[in-house]
Each structure stands twice: as structure tokens, then as C-alpha cells.
Design a protein with these regions (language model features):
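Alpha-helical interface subdomain recognition
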Residues: 2-4, 85-216
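Solvent-exposed alpha-helices and their adjacent loops that cap or buttress functional pockets
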Residues: 13-17, 27-29, 52-57, 79, ...
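Acidic-glycine-rich active-site phosphate/pyrophosphate-binding loop
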Residues: 72-81, 194
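Flexible, small-/acidic-enriched active-site or ligand-binding loops
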Residues: 12, 38-74
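Residue-level signal for inorganic ion chemistry
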Residues: 7, 35, 64, 102, ...
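A generic structural signal for well-ordered coil/turn residues at beta-strand boundaries
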Residues: 17-19, 30-31, 40, 56-63, ...
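Conserved hydrophobic/aromatic beta-strand scaffold that supports enzyme active sites
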Residues: 2, 20-24, 34-36, 59-66
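A short core secondary-structure module
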Residues: 8-47
Length: 216
């Protein structure tokens, strides 16, 4: 006995380079299930897509057209798959990724603004610049604490769905704002590749889309 998989998924990390694919599918009459699929198998195709951010992840579009897999390829025969938990855990990972990128934005822009001199003084002496840096630090701390809380509750075996969602929501909304503010603080330099803030801005924009629409 086996299964036939049919479907298509975008934004698959390393989808064109992976040696094995982990595929989540909805089985007729059974519910969600997970399978390990060989990407070289007949019916499996992948196309690397040029996204504006997260390019090192080699995000790809993977298509499965009547792919036949054996029953042994199905994971968790003894324990039903908790797909919602998998999604919630991935939300925590996405939030943590955003926290790291936002920390890089803060560190870089703070040093730049302290060294950038205009009208005889560092631009951090201007209230508008100092306030923007302070706002980035405040929002980043909020992102980090929500992510820590969600991860801690998950590790302790406590309910964490709400916490994971809030961490993802904060990371997506505030992450994009921090990326935008980082570019803004550098002015014209924020739009050239000599400075990394343009890369982080693109990455944060892409991170906000990894988990799909925020209300989901």
C-alpha cells in the first residue's frame, strides 16, 4: 500500500538543493500527514525563484504531480501528526530570525549615526535621530521577549499557540518598520550595497511573508 501526492508549494527553503523533502499533505478521510519524499522521484519538480530577500535560503517552488510514495515514507504512524504544533514552532523560529536581523540593524545604525558628523556634531545629537534609534531598541526588546516567552512555554510543554502567534505578529510588523527605519537613518547611503541595511531591509520584508498572511 502507498499514497499518491499532488500539490504545489512556494517559499520552500533549499527546495532545489535538498536531498530529501519533508512534505505535509491532507489525506482523504484521514487528515494531515507528513512524508519523506526523494526530490529525484518521478513527478517531483522544483524551480528556484528570485525573491528580494533571504537569498541564501534558496527559496524555491516545489511541485508534486501524482507522486507515488510507499507507506514507509509516512512519518508518525504510531503518533498522530500535530500539524498545528509544527506550524506554531515554525512561527517561533521565524520570529527568532527576525530578532537577529533587527539586532544587526540596530548595532549598525547606532554606530553609523555616532560616527556620522553633520554641522559639526554626530547626528545622534539630533532628537529625531536619537528618538528613532530609541524606538528601534524598544520594539526590538518587545520582539525578543515575546519570542523568548513562546520558546520557553513550548520547551516546558505548556500551551504556546497564542504566544507563537504574537511573536510572529510582532516580528513581521515591527521587523519591517525597523528595516525601513534603518534605511532611513542612513539617508542616501541606505540605498547602496556598500552598507548592509538595504540587505537587512529586504530580508525582514521576506521574513514577514514566510508564514503567509498574518491573520491566518
Amino acid at each position: 500500500n502507498g499514497y499518491v501526492l499532488l500539490g504545489e508549494k512556494t517559499l520552500v527553503p533549499f527546495g532545489s538543493d535538498a536531498e530529501q523533502l519533508l512534505v505535509f499533505a491532507e489525506l482523504e478521510g484521514e487528515g494531515p500527514a507528513a512524508f519523506v519524499v526523494d526530490p529525484k522521484q518521478r513527478g517531483v519538480s522544483s524551480t528556484r525563484e528570485a525573491f528580494m530577500g533571504l537569498r541564501p535560503l534558496s527559496l524555491s517552488r516545489v511541485k508534486l504531480e501524482n507522486v507515488e510514495v510507499s507507506a514507509a515514507s509516512k512519518l508518525g504512524e504510531q503518533t498522530p501528526l500535530n500539524l498545528e504544533r509544527v506550524i506554531d514552532l515554525s512561527r517561533i523560529g521565524t520570529a527568532a530570525l527576525a530578532v537577529g536581523v533587527c539586532q544587526a540593524v540596530l548595532d549598525y545604525t547606532k554606530n553609523y549615526c555616532n560616527e556620522r558628523v553633520a554641522f559639526g556634531e554626530p547626528i545622534t545629537h539630533r532628537q529625531s535621530v536619537a528618538f528613532m534609534l530609541a524606538d528601534i531598541a524598544i520594539e526590538l526588546d518587545g520582539m525578543r521577549l515575546l519570542t523568548y516567552r513562546a520558546a520557553s512555554r513550548a520547551e516546558q510543554g505548556l500551551p504556546f499557540k497564542r504566544d507563537a502567534y504574537l511573536a510572529q505578529l510582532q516580528a513581521a510588523e515591527k521587523g519591517m518598520k525597523i528595516g525601513t527605519d534603518g534605511v532611513q537613518l542612513l539617508g542616501g547611503h541606505g540605498f547602496i550595497r556598500e552598507h548592509l541595511v538595504e540587505l537587512w531591509y529586504r530580508n525582514l520584508r521576506a521574513i514577514s511573508l514566510l508564514q503567509g498572511s498574518l491573520p491566518v
